[in-house]
UniProtKB/Swiss-Prot annotation:
InterPro entries: Ribosomal_L11_MeTrfase_PrmA, Ribosomal_PrmA_MeTrfase, SAM-dependent_MTases_sf
A GO MF label: protein-lysine N-methyltransferase activity
Function: Methylates ribosomal protein L11.
Enzyme class, first EC level, given as a word: transferase
Protein name according to UniProt: Ribosomal protein L11 methyltransferase
Pfam families, sorted: PrmA
CC annotations in GO: cytoplasm
Organism: Desulfatibacillum aliphaticivorans
Catalytic reaction list: L-lysyl-[protein] + 3 S-adenosyl-L-methionine = N(6),N(6),N(6)-trimethyl-L-lysyl-[protein] + 3 S-adenosyl-L-homocysteine + 3 H(+)
GO BP: methylation
Keyword Phosphoprotein carried by entry: no
Main subcellular location: cytoplasm
Entry's localization field: Cytoplasm
CDD domains: AdoMet_MTases (cd02440)
């Protein structure tokens, strides 16, 4: 398969925030093999974090879209999304296109995916690296491949930290991750004491990667379940006492009205993947469904929200 390399070069008053938001947008529009550069350094990883080497003279985000029947639509949607950031997050930007084969970048991101500690008790590490663990943290070991997050993006870190906080109060009997991707939130919840963990995603490749990662992290087959579908479509089992969704603000707004059908009374919902300027959209949707907001956490321009069902 051929791929289109898309390089977005930009100027911004807050370049780190802009870089995170642009990288998140391109991943949301189906991009893979993400690379981010900053003047004086560069770092290549799946979701924008990791080590760096002296190299770049510009702020940029480079990613790859498959040259398939969906390419033109994705390209147009991404252009509109970038235009929405201009004037607020971005002062200016340009986009450059180049056809590429996938082999040169298929595994290059691995060199920059290193262990990262999350919260008080978790650490995410790649399967190919060793990790000294004097604090006896619970290990989440991933080999996510190109298409799924390594867990180092701020939205994932915020979500895992909030899951940890709630699990320390009371670990759930039944945990659900909406848009599970690599399965990292399911694994984290299980390590933190959840008895049964479930996940849904609209991408079969994601579900296959999640199943592999769950088994690789000693989550017993009888303790997890995976569904294919958008948001809550296809989920017939209810009474979850913790639900997490690390998706966009707009997707969270669409998700929230359906939550009372599948959540137990008094259960907790954790929403992440929310740009700070869009948090009110999610807060309003929660209020309309009578959720009580218990915590709002912001990191690097991204927001996580914990809210309780009535």
């Amino acid at each position: 398969m051929q791929w289109m390399e898309i390089k977005i070069v930009f100027d911004a008053a807050e370049p780190e925030l802009a870089q995170e938001m642009v990288s998140y947008l391109v991943m949301e529009h189906g991009a893979e093999g993400l690379e981010m550069t900053t003047p004086g350094e560069t770092g290549m990883v799946q979701d924008g974090s990791g080590s760096s080497v002296p190299d770049s003279k510009e702020h940029s985000v480079t990613a790859f879209l498959p040259l398939d029947d969906l390419f033109e639509g994705r390209k147009a949607d991404l252009t509109r999304a970038l235009d929405d950031l201009k004037g607020s997050v971005l002062t200016d930007y340009s986009v450059h296109f180049s056809k590429q084969d996938d082999q040169p970048w298929e595994t290059a991101w691995k060199a920059h995916f290193h262990p990262i500690e999350i919260g008080e008790s978790l650490v995410i590490k790649p399967s190919w690296e060793d990790y000294e663990n004097p604090e006896k943290r619970m290990l989440i070991e991933l080999d996510p491949g190109m298409a799924f997050g390594t867990g180092t993006h701020p939205t994932t870190a915020v979500c895992l930290e909030m899951i940890e906080t709630e699990c320390l109060k009371k670990a759930p009997e039944r945990f659900l991750d909406v848009g599970t991707g690599s399965g990292i939130l399911m694994i984290g919840a299980y390590k933190l004491g959840a008895r049964k963990v479930f996940g849904c995603d609209n991408d079969m490749d994601a579900l296959e990667a999640a199943a592999k990662n769950l088994k690789g992290n000693q989550v017993h087959e009888g303790d997890f379940g995976l569904w294919l579908g958008d948001l809550l479509a296809g989920i017939v089992e209810g009474a979850f006492d913790m639900v997490a969704a690390n998706i966009t603000a707009e997707a969270n707004v669409m998700l929230i009205p359906g939550l009372p059908r599948i959540m137990a009374p008094g259960s907790i919902f954790i929403a992440s993947g929310i740009m700070a300027e869009k948090k009110d959209l999610v807060l309003e949707a929660l209020d309309a469904c009578r959720f009580s907001v218990e915590r709002v956490q912001e990191t690097g321009g991204w927001v996580g929200i914990a809210a309780r069902m009535p």
